From Swiss-Prot:
Enzyme class: transferase
Source domain of life: Bacteria
Annotated [4Fe-4S] cluster binding sites: C125, C212, C309
Binding site for iminosuccinate: H59, S80, Y151, A152, N153, S168, H238, P239, E240, T255
InterPro entries the record matches: NadA, NadA_sf, Quinolinate_synth_A_type1
Pathway involvement of the protein, from the record: Cofactor biosynthesis; NAD(+) biosynthesis; quinolinate from iminoaspartate: step 1/1
SUPFAM superfamilies in the cross-refs: NadA-like
E.C. code: 2.5.1.72
Compartments where found: Cytoplasm
Organism: Burkholderia cenocepacia (strain HI2424)
Protein name: Quinolinate synthase
Cofactor(s) listed: [4Fe-4S] cluster
Gene Ontology biological process terms in this record: 'de novo' NAD biosynthetic process from L-aspartate
Catalytically driven reaction(s): iminosuccinate + dihydroxyacetone phosphate = quinolinate + phosphate + 2 H2O + H(+)
Length: 378
């Protein structure tokens, strides 16, 4: 069962001082520094991280040079929830989040007493943009009999309206559990991930009609042609992709799952349907293997993302150094919203911990593998 909410056009005109649309995001992407500038910026950032007693946490989708810097300085390169957990558990009182705004907010929710800084506060997410809290709250109010489940890629205010927050590592299990208890569900914001979970679980779900700008552009017909060109390649697909792309996957999962698959599969060649930023970590984890980007457009089409998130691309060495030097671009979350938003996050974490214990206690490796066959970390 799906909602009839009209999908959001992310390249619509955006008023100054509100949110950053696709065109504005690409306009704000920093120019690539020269080799000399890059070396100087990295040295400066390392010194500033030490001076500020700060730690850098970066998402798999930001540019390789930022991922390298996080690894080199004792930081973290991970999925969005692991970024927040790492920041929560680290001794540093200042976290530099290289990613998009909802990631900074999630870090602040889990570490309310820490200072959270971001290279550019305009770095947002099409899923977040496409799920305004006022509209979403009205939608929830219109269906009071349903349990509200939201994906991690949402604002703090939307999380505060939810009963559960999920990542793709545990979303199937949580929805299946809710379905087994007879609960009907509102799902937001990604319609493709929601549809994937709905088909796997058979749950009664109303799907908010949001989508990821990057994953929504992957094309099933062109992917089929690419597979014919490389018949030996395994296909790795993020579940935020359209159904006709997911259907061609050898592995469906998100960032951590897809990296693990690249390591564990015996294949030497992979077609990857997710943000190009992940290829850096895949190449490090599986040297000697070849990774091919899945097609985002046909010959006569143009792409808005070309398989790289424009908001992720707004993170660069220069603005990272600047935020450390000036101490600006701090993330704030209203304490009342933060407290409410933490409840669905903690509920998910508790469920995940209990679920992990149940799986480990089963002692059945074949059963365990089937449980995790098509899911990965958020």
């Amino acid at each position: 069962m799906q909602s009839t909410i009209k999908p959001v056009e992310y390249d619509r005109p955006v008023a100054a001082g509100t949110v950053c649309g696709v065109g504005q995001a690409w306009a704000k992407v920093p120019d690539a520094p020269s080799a000399e500038e890059r070396a100087a910026l990295k040295a400066r950032i390392k010194a500033l991280l030490a001076r500020e007693k700060a730690v850098l946490v970066a998402h798999y989708y930001v540019d390789a040079e930022l991922q390298e810097l996080a690894d080199e300085t004792g930081g973290c390169v991970a999925d969005s929830l692991e970024m927040a957990r790492f920041g929560r558990d680290h001794d540093a009182q200042t976290l530099i989040v290289a990613g998009v705004r909802f990631m900074g907010e999630t870090a602040k929710i889990l570490s309310p007493n820490k200072r959270i800084l971001m290279p550019d506060l305009d770095a947002t997410c099409s899923l977040d943009l496409g799920c305004p809290v006022d509209e979403f709250s009205a939608f929830c109010d219109a269906h009071p009999d349903r349990t509200v489940v939201v994906y991690a890629n949402t604002s703090a205010a939307v999380k505060a309206r939810a009963d559960w927050m999920v990542t793709s590592s545990i979303g199937l299990e949580i929805v299946a559990d809710l379905h087994a208890r007879g609960e009907k569900i509102i799902w937001a914001p990604d319609r493709h991930l929601g549809s994937y979970i709905q088909k796997k679980t058979g749950a009664d779900m109303l799907l908010w009609q949001g989508s990821c700008l990057v994953h929504d552009e992957f094309k099933g017909i062109e992917l089929d042609l690419l597979r014919a060109e490389y018949p030996d390649a395994k296909v790795l697909v993020h579940p935020e992709s359209p159904e006709n792309v997911v259907a061609q996957a050898d592995v469906v999962g998100s960032t951590t799952q897809l990296i693990d698959a690249a390591v564990k599969f015996d294949a030497k060649r992979f077609i990857v349907a997710t943000d190009l930023g992940i290829l850096h970590k895949m190449q490090l984890a599986a040297p000697g293997k070849t990774f091919i980007a899945a097609p985002t457009a046909g010959n006569s089409a143009t792409c808005k993302s070309c398989a790289h998130c424009p908001w992720m691309a707004m993170n660069g060495l220069a603005n990272l150094a600047d935020v450390l030097e000036r101490g600006h671009n701090e993330i704030f979350v209203d304490p009342a919203i933060g407290e409410r938003a933490r409840l669905p996050i903690d509920r998910m974490l508790e469920f995940a911990a209990a679920h992990k214990k149940r799986v480990q206690a089963s002692g059945d490796l074949q059963r365990d593998q089937s449980l995790f066959a098509n899911v990965g970390a958020a």
